[in-house]
Design a protein with these regions (language model features):
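A cross-family kinase active-site recognition segment
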Residues: 117-188, 218
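Active-site acidic catalytic loop and adjacent metal/ATP-binding pocket
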Residues: 34-45, 50-51, 85, 198-255
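ATP/Mg2+ or Mg2+-diphosphate-binding catalytic cores
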Residues: 170, 179, 271, 303-351
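Active-site activation/catalytic loop segments of kinase-like enzymes and analogous catalytic loops
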Residues: 251-282, 295-313
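A glycine-centered beta->alpha junction motif in the catalytic cores
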Residues: 56, 102-116, 165-179, 299-317
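ATP-binding pocket architecture of kinase catalytic cores
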Residues: 44-146
Length: 351
């Protein structure tokens, strides 16, 4: 998050002292992330630990901190650089205070790649090696991975309802006014977005059929390998952060990020795969699965931002910035088939 949580810093310092035996002299807020809050906690000896705060999970969702035992195991395996979680005095990896759940981890030095406009090929090559290292770690940590890919679209029903309301100019709920700017932005594109939703559901159905046939190809997936979750150290080490979305799934779940997102152009997918396979092993990828992940990620992001605007909960970024993000995502969604075509051509040439 860009703004600090509603929690007195002294409460957090006391918790770190009493439960973790950490003598903290200063908390430095780190204004990054979308659904969590982060601090660098500076100790009396000038060393630091990383403190992450999240809201408790909703009923039925994966519990917060489910990925922490996995992180501890990955740190031991050593194939990929991750922040090792630090247990409290009772050996627990999560604590709770003031309506937040808290994890304390090793502090990793480096710069976030979130705001990097362009990356050199050497860095992309290092990212390909990191993806390969994650997938190659599967056998050692399989028993600790908290989830398995089910190709679900939990956001879609609500988004379709919101989209219909925007198209008709109705409020999303009886007690809410529809933001005019949101209606004017999304309403004229509603028919095209509905077609995209139908395409996504078709891809989902195909992914489920394929997934039942090829369970043996499941690997450990990070699922959110983009700049804000990558930290580049001065010595060239690439640290991989934020593993709360980790699951067992097809390699396409990580590789789609390099198949035509704002993160990486579709026409360079083959270049990336050459480096990934050299560090891992040859893989046979499905263009339809990559398309599914491209569509799902775009619509999931769009649904979340539209919901925040429609319900008046876009406080963390602000309504104006969020509207800009929605406009950008819509433009991307309407160009997805161009990217999928590039992907099909590249995979066909590699076959």
């Amino acid at each position: 998050m860009r703004t600090e949580p509603e929690l007195d810093r002294r409460v957090l310092v006391d918790l770190l002292r009493d439960r973790y035996a950490l003598d903290i002299e200063r908390l430095d807020f780190i204004p990054l992330g979308i659904d969590s809050w982060s601090y660098a906690a500076v100790r009396s000896d000038s060393s630091r630990v990383f403190v992450k705060l999240v809201r408790p999970a909703v009923v039925g969702a994966t519990p917060r901190g489910a990925e922490l035992p996995l992180l501890a195991a990955l740190a031991e395996v050593g194939r990929v650089s991750v922040a090792r979680p630090l247990p409290d005095r009772a050996g627990r990896l999560m604590s709770a205070v003031g309506g937040y759940e808290i994890a304390v981890l090793e502090y990793l030095e480096g710069r976030s790649l979130e705001d990097e406009a362009t990356w050199p090929d050497a860095l992309y090559g290092r990212v390909a090696e990191a993806v390969a290292a994650i997938h190659a770690s599967t056998d050692a940590v399989r028993h600790l991975v908290p989830r398995v890919e089910r190709f679900e679209l939990p956001f879609l029903t609500s988004f379709a309802r919101t989209l219909a309301a925007l198209q008709a100019g109705r409020p999303v709920a009886d007690d809410e006014a529809m933001p005019i700017e949101l209606r004017d932005l999304v309403g004229p594109r509603a028919v095209e977005l509905q077609a995209g939703i139908e395409r996504l559901t078709d891809l989902r159905d195909g992914a489920r059929t394929r997934g039942r046939r090829q369970v043996a190809e499941e690997v450990l997936c990070h699922t959110d390998l983009w700049g804000s979750n990558l930290l580049l150290a001065d010595d060239g080490t690439l640290h991989v952060l934020d593993w709360d979305g980790a699951l067992l799934g097809p390699p396409e779940h990580d590789l789609f990020m390099f198949a035509g997102t704002g993160f990486f152009p579709a026409e360079r997918l083959g270049w990336f795969l050459d480096r990934y396979e050299a560090a891992f092993r040859p893989v046979r990828l499905s263009a339809d699965l990559l398309a599914f992940y491209l569509y799902r990620r775009s619509f999931e992001d769009l649904a979340g931002f539209v919901r925040d605007l429609a319900e008046g909960t876009a406080d963390a970024m602000g309504a104006v910035e969020t509207l800009g993000i929605v406009a950008s995502i819509i433009d991307d969604v309407l160009r997805l088939e161009e990217r999928v075509l590039h992907v099909r051509e590249i995979l066909r040439d590699r076959a």
